[in-house]
């Protein structure tokens, strides 16, 4: 059972998938934390599977040691002892002779019935004891060696009785026949003695049938025990093959465990490097966060100033528009005034030219007057000069 559960629980160990190498992100984020959690989870799974494999390997080794320390012969020892005891009880060294010897008184002479019994069982005595020894020390044996001897297979009560009657008719009763009937009257005839011997043989035949029946039962039990021994041997061979296979699997799992330990060490190193990188990234992230907060503060201030400047710029643009409108109006006014002034200038220039002409005329007149004064011009010349000046 332990081997089957081991095969079921370890089939997932060789193909345990490892996470593919994750590319390091350009910026620190939650991927590193997820990778760290994944490595921790894989570490816990590897430790649990390792403990399970080691425990099951110990159980398999312990079961194998128990099976090796307890061979099949010791497992069947109790059954063999019981069978040997029953067979020894049924087939003792004294045999059936001892059972029937109690029915007659002890005499110094030899009973001819006991001779017949000894003839029937002396050849089988060694076989019965040997068969009991074979049952005790042998794993494979035939039922004929234990159950029924070879001489019993051809035994028949009628043949035995006819044989004894023939011997009695030919030879007569032996001299020591009286020892058989020591407790019976000497007046018993030959027929009565024969009937007595027939009855005794009938009892012996019944007892022999009982013994044969018991032997048949024991033979069936021995066959059952043989089949059990065979099943036990097959089971032992299967268990041995299973143990060998499981030992190879244990070796394979040991190598896989060593490889997993190496991978675990590599993953631990990767995890430590990733943790260091994560710490560096966290420190850089904190620095970036602090600088980002300062930048955001400056940016907010700059945005506020930009908003202020936008408002001021809009105000300035509005003021410039107003000023431009006013200037435009002023320019228009100035243009109109300039036109007026130009017109006045033109008029003044015309007047000035006329005044210059008048001045020239007056100068000429003055010169003429002075010349007239000096030269005493005549009135006519003066009038000409005036006319010339008016023209």
UniProtKB/Swiss-Prot annotation:
Coiled coil: 188-351
Segments for region (Disordered): 1-31, 65-85
Compartment(s): Cytoplasm, Cytoskeleton, Microtubule organizing center, Centrosome, Centriolar satellite
Keywords of the record: Coiled coil, Cytoplasm, Cytoskeleton
The keyword Transcription is assigned to this record: no
Gene Ontology cellular component annotations, sorted alphabetically: centriolar satellite; cytoplasm
Annotated protein name in UniProt: Testis-expressed protein 9
Organism encoding this protein: Homo sapiens (Human)
């Amino acid at each position: 059972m332990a081997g089957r559960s081991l095969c079921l629980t370890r089939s997932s160990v060789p193909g345990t998938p490892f996470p593919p190498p994750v590319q390091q992100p350009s910026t620190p984020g939650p991927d590193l934390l997820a990778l760290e959690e994944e490595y921790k989870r894989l570490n816990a799974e590897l430790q649990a599977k390792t403990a399970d494999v080691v425990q099951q390997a110990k159980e398999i080794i312990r079961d194998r040691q128990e099976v090796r320390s307890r061979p099949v012969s010791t497992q069947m020892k109790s059954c063999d002892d019981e069978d040997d005891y029953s067979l020894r009880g049924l087939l003792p060294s004294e045999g059936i002779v001892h059972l029937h010897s109690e029915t007659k008184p002890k005499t110094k002479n030899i009973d001819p019935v006991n001779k017949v019994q000894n003839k029937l069982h002396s050849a089988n005595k060694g076989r019965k004891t040997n068969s009991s020894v074979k049952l005790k020390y042998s794993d494979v044996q035939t039922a004929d060696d234990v159950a029924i001897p070879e001489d019993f297979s051809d035994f028949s009560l009628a043949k035995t009785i006819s044989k004894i009657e023939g011997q009695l008719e030919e030879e007569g009763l032996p001299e020591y026949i009286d020892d058989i009937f020591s407790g019976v009257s000497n007046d018993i005839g030959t027929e009565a003695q024969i009937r007595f011997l027939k009855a005794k043989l009938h009892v012996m035949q019944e007892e022999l049938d009982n013994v044969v029946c018991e032997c048949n039962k024991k033979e069936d039990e021995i066959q059952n025990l043989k089949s059990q021994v065979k099943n036990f041997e097959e089971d032992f061979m299967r268990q041995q093959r299973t143990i060998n296979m499981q030992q190879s699997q244990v070796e394979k799992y040991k190598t896989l465990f060593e490889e997993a330990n190496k991978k675990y060490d590599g993953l631990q190193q990767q995890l430590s490097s990733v943790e260091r990188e994560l710490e560096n990234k966290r420190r850089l992230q904190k620095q970036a966060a602090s600088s980002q907060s300062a930048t955001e503060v400056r940016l907010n201030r700059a945005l506020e100033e930009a908003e202020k400047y936008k408002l001021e710029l809009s105000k300035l643009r509005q003021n410039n528009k107003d000023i431009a409108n006013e200037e435009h109006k002023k320019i228009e006014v100035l243009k109109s005034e300039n036109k007026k002034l130009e017109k006045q200038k033109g008029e003044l220039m015309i007047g000035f030219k006329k005044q210059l002409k008048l001045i020239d005329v007056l100068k000429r007149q003055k010169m003429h007057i002075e010349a007239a004064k000096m030269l005493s011009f005549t009135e006519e010349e003066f009038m000409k000069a005036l006319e010339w000046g008016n023209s």
